[in-house]
A protein has these predicted regions:
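Charged, low-cysteine interdomain linkers and short loop/connector segments
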Residues: 1-14
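Short, Lys/Arg-enriched N-terminal segment that forms or immediately precedes the first helix
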Residues: 12-26
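A short pre-motif secondary-structure segment
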Residues: 36-37
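Short helix-to-turn junction characteristic of helix-turn-helix DNA-binding domains
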Residues: 40-44
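Short alpha-helical "recognition helix" segments of helix-turn-helix
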Residues: 49-51
Length: 76
């Protein structure tokens, strides 16, 4: 769990959209998971908003977010 906290801090610290997209392009995340991360970290949307926007339950978005963090932590 602490790895996810560090990964979240690093994602929040990415200065530009381009750098963020390069990181996501290097990952094996699905397009949906990439969009969840973009909405949450770049546009600062909460999970309820993201779920409503993408047509999923908030809990589903939270689970996908955590799995995505686990998948990309090795890129840092």
């Amino acid at each position: 769990m602490s790895e996810n906290i560090e990964t979240r801090k690093k994602l929040k610290g990415i200065a530009s959209i381009t750098q963020f997209d390069v990181l996501l392009d290097q990952s094996t995340l699905s397009d949906l998971d990439k969009e969840i991360l973009r909405l949450h970290y770049l546009k600062e949307k909460d999970f309820r908003y993201i779920g409503d926007t993408l047509g999923f339950a908030e809990v589903t978005i939270k689970k996908r977010h955590l799995k995505a963090l686990s998948k990309i932590q090795s890129l840092f």
